[in-house]
C-alpha cells in the first residue's frame, strides 16, 4: 500500500506546480511604491508628490497617469514622451507638471504649484507598460496660517468689557483660546468659524470680562496640523466709576460748557482775523502779479469783427442784426442744401478765415445755459453727427445744463470761478494756441494743448435749445483795433479792457434735449 500512496503525492505536487506557472507568468514585471506618510503643503506654495518604480530603470517611454478618484479625472497624463494637456482636469492646467528628469531614475514626481485647499486628498500614480500596469497612492494635506489676530474692545454701561478676536485665512479649522496675563484660559461667550470661497476659515470669537482684577488678555489662534499659531495681547483699562452727587455733576457740566464757549469764541476770533489778513495779502499779491504780468507777459492780438456765414447755418438757426446774432428756433427754414451747410448739429461758422497771425473776438452768452463756442477747420465734416473733438478739427468749450466742458475726446470738465456772461476767444495760429477767457472777470477758462495747424480756421458757434435770446458776437466800436490781454492770466487777475459791444443775454432755463440735434426732431 505504500507505493500507491507515494505515487499519489508525487502526482499532486506536479499538478500544483503546473497550476502555478500561469500565475507567475502573468504577474507585472515591475512594482510601484509611494510614501506611507502624507505630504504636507502650505496654501500658495508648491507641493511635490513622488512615487517610485522598481526595478530601478528608465520609465521615460512608459505611460504615466496621476489621478484623483477615478482614472478619467486626470491630474496629469504622460504618454509618448510628453504631457497630454488635453486630457488634464481644468483646475490643474498650468499648475500641475511632471519632473521628467526623475523618470530616468525610476521616479515620477508630480509638481503642483500654488497649492489650494481643494487640492487636499488622495492622488494615485499609475505606470503602464503595454498591457502591464501598477499603481500606488499618495495623500496630500493642505494647511494655512492666517492673518495676525485683531482684538476690539467695547465697554458696556455696567462697566463690563466685551472683547472680540478676529482673524482670517486659516486651514484647517483653527483652535482659538483666550488667556489672561497669568496664562489662565477663559471660555468664549460666542464663536464663529466660516470658510470663504477658497476654503479658508475666518474666525470671530467673543468673551465678556467681568473680573476687574484682570489687567491683560491675549487671543491665541493655533493651527493644530502645523503646530503653529499667532497671538495678540491687549491691556485692559482700569475700572473707574466715581460716585458723584447731582450738584457736582451740574457744576462740572456748566464749567465744561463755559470752557467750550470760551475756546470757541477765541478760535472764531482768531480764524476771522486770519481770513481777513489772508484776503488783504491776496489782494496785494494780485495787484503785484498784475503789474508784473503787464511788464513781462503782454501779448498783442488783433480784434476781429466776426460775422456769421448764412451758407453754413443749420436750417433751424436764424441769423439777425447783420449776421451778428444767432438763435435756434423750432421751425425749419427752407434753404439750399449746400456742401458747407450743417445738416445735423445746430451749428454755424463765421465768414472770416485764419491761416496765420494772432486773432481775438468776444461772444456775449449772457444767462444762456447752453452753447458751444470755438474754432474749427474750414473743411470739417458738416453732414451727420461726427464728434466735435480736436481729432475731427474742432476746438471749442461749451455750457450744457450746469456744467462747463472742453470738447476733448473724453470731455474735460471745467471748474470756473464764476459763470461768464461774455467769452473771449484767443487764437494764435502760428504758435498753435487756442485759449478761452471769461471777459467778465478776466480769468482763464481753458487752453487747448499746443498743436500745429494746417489749413484755414474759422470761428464756430453752436446752440442746443430753442426759444431763447440770441447768441451775439460783440462788434468792434470803431473797426478793428489792438487789444492787450495777459498771457496765462490767473483766475483772480482782472482782464482789461473788456469792450462794450454787447448787452447781456436772457435768463431762461434749459428745457431742450437737442443733443444730438437731428432735423427730424423739429417740424418745418
Swiss-Prot record:
Q: Please give the tissue specificity annotation from the record for this chain.
A: Strongly expressed in lactating mammary tissue (at protein level). About 100-fold lower levels in virgin mammary tissue. Also detected in spleen and thymus at 10-20 times lower levels compared to those detected in virgin mammary gland. Very low levels in several other tissues, including brain, heart, kidney, lymph node, lung and small intestine. In the thymus, detected in the stroma, in epithelial cells (at protein level). Most prominent in medullary areas of the thymus and at the corticomedullary junction (at protein level).
* Leader sequence residues: 1-26
Membrane topology per the entry is: Single-pass type I membrane protein
Task: Name the SUPFAM superfamilies on file.
Answer: Concanavalin A-like lectins/glucanases (SSF49899), Immunoglobulin (SSF48726)
B30.2/SPRY domain mapped to chain residues: 286-480
For this record, an example GO cellular component is: membrane
Quote the PTM field: N-glycosylated.
Q: Which residues cross the membrane?
A: 248-268
Q: Which residues lie on this side of the membrane: Cytoplasmic?
A: 269-524
Q: Where in the cell is it found?
A: Membrane
Q: Which residues lie on this side of the membrane: Extracellular?
A: 27-247
Q: Which residues form the Ig-like V-type domain?
A: 29-141, 149-235
Record bears the keyword Membrane? yes
Residue positions the entry lists as glycosylated: 56, 216
Subunit and partners? Seems to associate with xanthine dehydrogenase/oxidase.
Q: What is this protein called?
A: Butyrophilin subfamily 1 member A1
